[in-house]
Amino acid sequence: MTTPFKRIHLIVMDSVGIGEGPDAAAFNDEGSHTLKHTLEGFEQDLPNLQRLGLGNIAPLPVVEEVEQPEAFYTKLSEASVGKDTMTGHWEIMGLNIMQPFKVYPDGFPDELVKEIEDMTGRKVVANRPASGTQIIDEWGEHQMKTGDLIVYTSADPVLQIAAHEDVIPLEELYDICEKVRELTKDPKYLIGRIIARPYVGEPGNFTRTSNRHDYALKPFGRTVMNELKDNNYDVIAIGKINDIYDGEGVTEAIRTKNNMDGMDKLIDVVKHDFTGISFLNLVDFDALYGHRRDKEGYAQAIKDFDERLPELIDNLQEDDLVIITADHGNDPIAPGTDHTREYIPVLLYSPKLKDKAHELSGDTTFSSIGATIADNFDVPLPEYGRSFLSEMNVEK
């Protein structure tokens, strides 16, 4: 069967929101605008995102509106009740998440800590939000002496357990994380991911190893990715996409080290023949800059991404479609360190349609991205969202 686009490459710029969502007040996020606030005072331009039409979606510093953008453009609001990475990504692929994952800005409750201690026979230490390197520097030597579990979290709904590989063998750490995963499926906790964070080294020189393992929840329903896989299309997950969906609907998973490595891996995928989708998450915007409220670093990361777009575009086939979007906001000037409830930008670029691009109606949800992908490959559409193909005047 011939499809309008043989391949769709979906890129999520993690946390790159484009202004407060219609229900931002309910999340205490009035006035949030990740892109605008990140780019204010930035002295470099973003010529490639500009020519695609990013500045046509909303007024932005250093990104001007253009008369004829090369990409179709709009912005979408979130229907689900959370503003975390998993919720945003699951909605992009067609789900509406009505029960929010829980975050723990003050650490995990005593009841859960006691359950973990009773189950493992090991004491829990730390129990607060922290960066992984920081918490290991602080507690690593103690952990080596005692065998305690370093438990910590972040602004995301995650519970991370760090332990020295010479003190708690990997298999035991993995077993502990599997058991904690089962514990935290309880609705009163509902944590999105449990992460094993092994490290090695000596005090003052600890390093985390590549033996990290994520124990996610499976999506709360079938996604567009499941439909694609079941219909023998390729679903190539790049970066943390495989973890976000717990492997559901994925045919190939490719790990990445950072944003630029993610772009390298995507461009390599684009150079090889396949039929279906590639799906890349660029996490640095969120993890390295948004949560840390590093406005300058965030802006430079967007510039670095902008500079990679010509190489990506030059390697596209005529019947490829690239979708650039986000999953939530993370305004670097907002109070605290949490995500912000924002619209997400959507740019849809295809070499065969770049002279015909225009604004798309945006009165719909993140799921319209998944609906567009499903419509293109003629697989069952999600219950939520609306395909943009007809508005793009794409013949099926």
UniProtKB/Swiss-Prot annotation:
GO molecular function, one term: manganese ion binding
EC number(s) stated in the UniProt entry for this protein: 5.4.2.7
Entry binding sites for Mn(2+) 1: 14, 327-328
Subcellular location, record wording: Cytoplasm
Gene behind the chain: deoB
Identification of the protein by name: Phosphopentomutase
Amino acids binding Mn(2+) 2: 286, 291, 339
GO cellular component, one term: cytosol
Species name: Staphylococcus carnosus (strain TM300)
Catalytic reactions on record: 2-deoxy-alpha-D-ribose 1-phosphate = 2-deoxy-D-ribose 5-phosphate; alpha-D-ribose 1-phosphate = D-ribose 5-phosphate
Role played: Isomerase that catalyzes the conversion of deoxy-ribose 1-phosphate (dRib-1-P) and ribose 1-phosphate (Rib-1-P) to deoxy-ribose 5-phosphate (dRib-5-P) and ribose 5-phosphate (Rib-5-P), respectively.
Keywords, alphabetical: Cytoplasm, Isomerase, Manganese, Metal-binding
Comment on bound cofactor: Binds 2 manganese ions.
Cofactor: Mn(2+)
Enzyme class at the top of the EC tree: isomerase
This protein's pathway: Carbohydrate degradation; 2-deoxy-D-ribose 1-phosphate degradation; D-glyceraldehyde 3-phosphate and acetaldehyde from 2-deoxy-alpha-D-ribose 1-phosphate: step 1/2
Record's keyword annotation contains Isomerase: yes
NCBIfam families to which the protein is assigned, alphabetical: deoB (TIGR01696), PRK05362.1 (NF003766)
Intrachain S-S bonds: none
Annotated CDD domains: PPM
